[in-house]
Amino acid sequence: MDNIVLGTKGKRLGRKALREKIEALGQSFGLEIEPEKKVYDMSVSEKQTVEILKVLYRGAQILILDEPTAVLTPQETERLFKILRRMREQGCAIIIITHKLNEVLSISDRVTILRKGKSIETVETAGCDEKKLTEL
């Protein structure tokens, strides 16, 4: 719980109210965690969940993820994608930086190809496959 609210400004809530707020926020996005669990006792996936809850707690509307699945199992990746889809449905903009084309196609609406720091092309993923993306 402290990991989520540390550094926030404004009115401080009591621990019970804070716990309830974090649990409600987590439930609305499918981010179930144990608020009192210590970070050193968490899996990589749980730590990632805490980081996402942190930005949501602060009211962020844009989430930027750099290689978010690099150390996740396939099950953890699918869980993360479910969370991201729910966030998108609730109005969050999500930017994912990755080299995993199959994941790009499964989670995104559109993709921008970058080479040497320059934007090459942006395409809708609905009509794309991995081969087309590599040819851009």
What are these regions (language model features)?
Residues M1-L136:
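Glycine-rich phosphate-binding loops of nucleotide-dependent enzymes
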